[in-house]
Amino acid sequence: MLMITSFANPRVAQAFVDYMATQGVILTIQQHHQSDVWLADESQAERVRAELARFLENPADPRYLAASWQSGHTGSGLHYRRFPFIATLRERAGPVTWLIMIACILVFVVMSIVGAQSVMVWLAWPFDPSLKFEFWRYFTHAFMHFSLMHILFNLLWWWYIGGAVEKRLGSGKLIVITVISALLSGYVQQKFSGPWFGGLSGVVYALMGYAWLRGERDPQSGIYLQRGLIAFALIWIVAGWFDVFGMSMANGAHIAGLAVGLAMAFADTVNARKRT
């Protein structure tokens, strides 16, 4: 048995399983925290992964709905739940994912009340040589956000990718990626713009790079990022670099974070590639 992927939504998992059944491939679903899709005949793994990539690009394609009707599995025995918004967040996010989200929200609220400068004095990258031993500053810059759009954008991606990493690989792995990427992306960004910056985007880009390359090199890990999303991330970096949107972006942090994530994924998958 080989685990192909995992879906947070059991309906989506069933749609893919039903479609593959019409293609002559039998998959099974095991319900744990998420819906894990397993393949019994491992010789069909490459074919299934290719179909999965197409499915993820457009899971709402009518052919997948038609396959569900054709397979006759609407009474498959899966007990679907209607997740309210908060329950959906909780289903995908582990404790570290939640802790960072709460920290960012609390810092944002305090910044809104007392002003950004008052908070940056305590949390920003060391802006004076006398502060270089205040070690929290090398990481807490990631908790500061300067607009509602800024924090919503970063926390959405953090929840989506960071939550998946924590659920599949554990809290320890998410902590390591977060700490290393916050440190190195912050270091690069302060070389570009000085110490007055903030945001979780360097960590988010690290998670994007990690999830994409980990999925490409080690699909059995259950971690992946669709190629369309990594392409979007690269386009966003280019747009920020050339100031296409006229917004201030932490371009150094984005590039450094992405590089950190790719490097960590490569290191983590070396042994997996050797096994295959």
From Swiss-Prot:
Its main location: membrane. It is a multi-pass membrane protein. The keyword Zinc-finger does not apply. Its EC number is 3.4.21.105. Keywords: Cell inner membrane, Cell membrane, Hydrolase, Membrane, Protease, Serine protease, Transmembrane, Transmembrane helix. The chain crosses the membrane at residues 96-116, 142-162, 169-189, 192-212, 229-249, 250-270. It is found in: Cell inner membrane. GO terms for cellular component: plasma membrane. The active site is at S201 (nucleophile), H254. One of its GO terms (molecular function) is serine-type endopeptidase activity. InterPro entries: GlpG_N_sf, Peptidase_S54_GlpG_N, Peptidase_S54_rhomboid_dom, Rhomboid-like_sf, Rhomboid_protease_GlpG. One of its GO terms (biological process) is proteolysis. It catalyses: Cleaves type-1 transmembrane domains using a catalytic dyad composed of serine and histidine that are contributed by different transmembrane domains. It holds the Pfam family Rhomboid. Belongs to the peptidase S54 family. PANTHER family: RHOMBOID PROTEASE GLPG (PTHR43066:SF26), RHOMBOID-RELATED PROTEIN (PTHR43066). Rhomboid-type serine protease that catalyzes intramembrane proteolysis. This is Rhomboid protease GlpG.
